[in-house]
Amino acid sequence: MDTFVKIDAYSDKPGEARLAIDDAMQTFQKTAQVTDRFNDGGPGSLYEANSKAAAAPVTLAPQLAGLLNYLDHQPDAQLDIAIAPVVDLWQLARSQNRLPAPEKLQESLRHTGKDKYHFDAAAQTLSYNDPDVKLDLGSVAKGYAVDAAAATLKKHSGITCALINAGGNIKAIGNKPGNMPWRVAIQHPRDPEAFLGTVMLHDGQSAATSGDYQRYYELNGIRYHHILDPQTGQPSRLHQSVTVIAPSALDADYHSTLFFLLPTTEIKNRLTAAKDLAVVIVENDGSIFVSENLQQTWQPAKGI
């Protein structure tokens, strides 16, 4: 996981904040290692599972099993963690400054889908029934690691409040000094030097943004980004960015990716049932939707 992590922590005990931050960073790094498919995170890691789970069930590290257990209880087919073959095809095409061949794209889609793998929660094992399937947890791993780091911080009794920021996946622990909520900025999806506006995070809340500006390349004036529709294998064109405020960093990360793949009308329907989620959406045409439960605290940047 290639991301910059910053932790601001406050303590009423001398030296406690530095110790807590070091411990939280170690937790983040360990969680990131076992959920990263590109680097060998050791026994029970996703790297090992992707290498061996087609031959026999792989016993998972507790951190990886915990994340897969969460995902196993999510019913949304629109977010497919078995999309790695398609992701790899696009990464190869990007390195050669071209588009994937349509027939190659269709072939890679044959090796995706929840039916291609089996997670046994009781045994904490993972197996694949297709030798070409691989899981990619990039849509949720950062949020999961942020929650793990936050749990480590809270074990230090002297920590009064903290803010964790892992590449835009942000979590608040307590209110900031002065008992005020944390105000965090949302990146403008078309201006890397500007922000769209700010939202407030209270104790325990998290924010995550998925956008077409984070990893992309352009061909003939068309932007090809990394958030792929698992039905078509193509970059989703519904939004420029989706920011989600949620009770956990994992929930925020999961739903920001999921909502990026859904039309705004469906997102609104889901928000009716999920009262603990709030969103800021930049549509493909640049218009902005802010959910009703965020209207009073949302502060757009000047000129927005």
Name each model feature, range by range.
Residues D8, A82, A148-A149, I173, ...:
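Generic hydrophobic alpha-helical membrane-span motif
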Residues A121, N165, E218, D229-P230, ...:
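Short, acidic, Ser/Thr-enriched surface-loop or helix-capping motifs
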Residues A9-Y10, A82-V86, N165-A166, I186-H188, ...:
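Active-site-proximal beta-strand/loop segments in catalytic clefts of secreted hydrolases
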Residues N175-D229:
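Single conserved position on a long alpha-helix in the C-terminal lobe of the eukaryotic protein kinase
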Residues M1-L135, K154-C161, Q234-I304:
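A contiguous, well-ordered beta/alpha segment that forms the leading edge of an enzyme domain
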Residues K13, G143, G178-N179, R215, ...:
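Short, surface-exposed beta-strand-loop junctions and turns on beta-sheet-rich folds
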Residues D120-A121, L126-P189, A194-F195:
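RNase III-family endoribonuclease catalytic core
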